[in-house]
Amino acid sequence: SGRVQKDPLTIEIDSVDALPAIEQQFFETSQQGKIPLLQKLLSQHQPASCVVFCNTKKDCQSVCDALNAAGQSALSLHGDLEQRDRDQTLVRFANGSARVLVATDVAARGLDIKSLELVVNFELAWDPEVHVHRIGRTARAGNSGLAISFCAPEEAQRANILSEMLQIKLNWMNPPAGVSLVPLEAEMATLCIDGGKKAKMRPGDVLRSEEHTSEL
């Protein structure tokens, strides 16, 4: 092909065999059906930690808002956040103050989360290599993991390209039936105290703040 193409493009994708402990599941759904399906799957699997990937900042925030409205503890991570807010989000997710992190690919660069049980592609990535990087965040350090991908009709071509590039047959699943929505509550709560020596704060002040919070 190099003799007939002026500048042939070679696409290299990490072998899916390099991710043997990851189970991949694909669900066909409409755009409107993605949020209800996500809520059902979170209720079904009850992950201790989950990252949901979106392709845009707008979708990232709207998905996060919808999950929180349904009692699923979620945080958003996207480019519109200030660095301080981004850092606080990562700390809260790492210590269990939220069980779901809804993120864009750009904001999630360099994100390293231990024992991540579930990755959800709310939208299929445009680039198959990005898909591999997304799902590769689970099943680390010898652990197993689950990667779930949603596919709306307009994303069918991306699914076909993904199957071809990874040389795998996609595992299409039926939506779960008879699943009751169960709140995905956070295991911990994080207190953000904006003060210190200059504010003349003492350890006892922090303790009293925690006691007051527990009484609310």
Give the positions of each predicted feature.
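Conserved interdomain hinge at the start of the Helicase C-terminal
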Residues: 21-68, 209
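Conserved small/polar residues in nucleotide/adenosyl-binding loops
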Residues: 211-216
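Short regulatory helix/loop adjacent to the ATP-binding pocket of P-loop NTPases
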Residues: 1-5, 16, 64, 106, ...
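Conserved segment of the helicase C-terminal RecA-like domain
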Residues: 100, 135-176
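Conserved helicase ATPase core of P-loop NTP-dependent helicases/translocases
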Residues: 61-66, 72-104
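A short beta-strand element within the Helicase C-terminal
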Residues: 109-124, 146-149
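Post-DEXD/H (motif II) to motif III coupling segment of the RecA-like Helicase ATP-binding lobe
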Residues: 1-18, 160-169
